[in-house]
Design a protein with these regions (language model features):
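Charge-rich, low-complexity N-terminal segments
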Residues: 1-138
Length: 138
């Protein structure tokens, strides 16, 4: 059974380019092996991530993320059964979220992933994918 999981977390320290590159490389390798797809949204001091795949694989990965010492304030926003993947083209992709981004300010001036609905979070992700160029690591 396929599921789509959406969570938000904060890094323990500052997000660096080196950290992001390492996350993308490790995620892409692991996700390809486990047939997981998804996207990572980074910015404003947080990570917002979607994972798609077989329930057991996604649950195991989410458990690893929750116990990862690089994450804090990990919060599950949604998990749902799906019939098809939304992000099937990427084992992992990256988009940037910035509260200084005019598109984000105009469309969602008060966006806070910890308070937002999953629907609003997916709308933001869709807009970021359409208006930006996801950094792919497949």
């Amino acid at each position: 059974m396929l599921v789509r999981l959406l969570y938000v977390s904060q890094p323990v320290g500052p997000i660096t380019t080196t950290m992001t590159t390492l996350i993308l490389e490790k995620s892409a390798a692991y996700n390809k092996k486990e047939n997981i797809t998804g996207i990572l949204c980074q910015g404003s001091g947080l990570w917002l991530q979607v994972l798609e795949g077989e329930r057991s694989h996604v649950n195991l990965l989410y458990a690893r993320i929750m116990s990862d010492r690089n994450h804090r304030n990990v919060e599950l926003l949604s998990i749902e059964e799906i019939t098809h993947r939304r992000f099937c083209q990427w084992s992992m992709a990256l988009v940037y979220l910035s509260k200084d981004d005019p598109m984000v300010q105009m469309a969602h001036p008060e966006f806070d992933p910890y308070k937002a609905s999953a629907k609003d979070a997916f709308l933001i992700l869709d807009e970021l994918i359409k208006t930006g160029s996801p950094i792919l690591n497949t």
